[in-house]
Amino acid sequence: MAVTVVDPLVEQPDYLPPPPKVVTTPCDPWPRPYFLEDGLRRVKPYHFTYNTNVKQRWRGREILDIFTDEFRDRPKEYYKDAIESGKIQVNGQPFASVTSQVKNGDVISHTLHRHEPPVTGQPIGIVHEDDDLIVINKPAGVPVHPAGRYNYNSVVEIMRAERGHQWNPLPVNRLDRLTSGVMFIGKHKKAAEKLTDQLVGRTVRKEYVARVRGEFPEGDVICEEPILQISPKLGLNRVRASGKSAKTVFKRLAYYLPKLSESGEPQGAGYSIVRCLPLTGRTHQLRVHLQFLGHPITNDPIYANRRVFGANLGKATVDSDDDEDVMTRLSRMGKTEVADAVAYEDEMVEQYNKKKAEKMTGELCDICQTPLYSDPGPHELGIYLHAKKYADADGRWSYETSLPEWALPPKGYEGPTEATPESDPLAIDIAKLQLDDEKPSNEQQAGASDGQQQAATAS
């Protein structure tokens, strides 16, 4: 069954009073200011204070440069005014000027009128629930934890809003914001730790399904290329000899021919539906391995983007000669820009730039004068990657979802409506592979308590 989406909550006042001069803790409005409109879950803007310790890369830098470079969702003029008006402070005190430098041990506070991006209004589906765990079907485009511009529009906060303020969900595995599918939520620490041990111990089999460019080869395709994190800030990972060991088994489920133009010429290369079985859990493992094989996920905003990787989309690239150029292009356009994987051909660049400009509505917020964005399109709400099934290696439990709509046969075509039960390449003792999974990052531990660890995923 699916969790019922809450009705629009209590109306918020049209006017929100300004925050006090010094705010040291984030506000916590309850009930959460959600409302549903045009198929999207929206959050009414609210005042909020971010508090963060100075990062190593910030030390000795001017405060205006830090905010302009690190937080690109607002223009430089906004941050200049926020510093001068005391909305951005250091250790509870206003900065002397926009050129003030920060040092180790400083705590930076930023009080702002927060505008969260809308996410899909699709409810969080419940695959299974008992006294210990909730197994959910995470919608694409919804982050697991509050991060970046997302706070209440996150899995943790949406479920808390539906189940009560005191309820503390403990995510065990983590999916990327753009990825959908099976996720485990612990109801208490012991249950979360038990499943975490299984994930870290590699006794859980994971099955994903992806929609990729072109005609993927038939048969089992095994990719064992190591993966290196090139830029944590940009979320960029690539195949590199100096990276961490990684292994994925792929199996094509279907190939669909491209549409024909009026002249009868094929448009594009068609696409394949691919079963993905990660044997390790590197960040972006499936996305990076599929790119390396020359079949990136069709709408992947990073790894299927010709504006970033060029004509060959990073196929079979193992050297670092173009890393700096790739990072520059990705940073310049923003990894979540409208182009995503659309601007494949040179003639589409102009169209992309037009769409990019249309992201801004031209309107300003009445309270904070922040430029307002238009609603995200379908291509910004997720990618064609879905965690379909998680199963205990010893057969004690198994949870799976149906295929997402984008993986079903298009009209007029025949193809699988469910994943086919081929011989399973994972029918081995996974723990004996001696491939070290990544340890959970700080972000992955954000929803845990008392040192609980979360297992990294391969998405």
How should these model regions be labeled?
Residues M1-E77, D81, L236, A241-K247, ...:
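Pseudouridine synthases involved in rRNA/tRNA modification
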Residues A82-I83, V102, P278:
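Short, well-ordered loop/turn sites that connect or cap secondary structure elements
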Residues G92-S97, G270-I273:
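Short alpha-helix capping/helix-loop boundary micro-motifs
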Residues K103-Y150, D220-E225:
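Conserved beta/loop motifs at nucleotide-recognition and modification sites
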Residues N151-W167, P232-L234:
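Internal amphipathic helical hairpin motif
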Residues M183-P232, A241:
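N-terminal accessory regions of nucleic-acid-interacting proteins
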Residues L195, R282-L290:
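Short beta-strand segments enriched for Tyr within beta-sheet-rich domains
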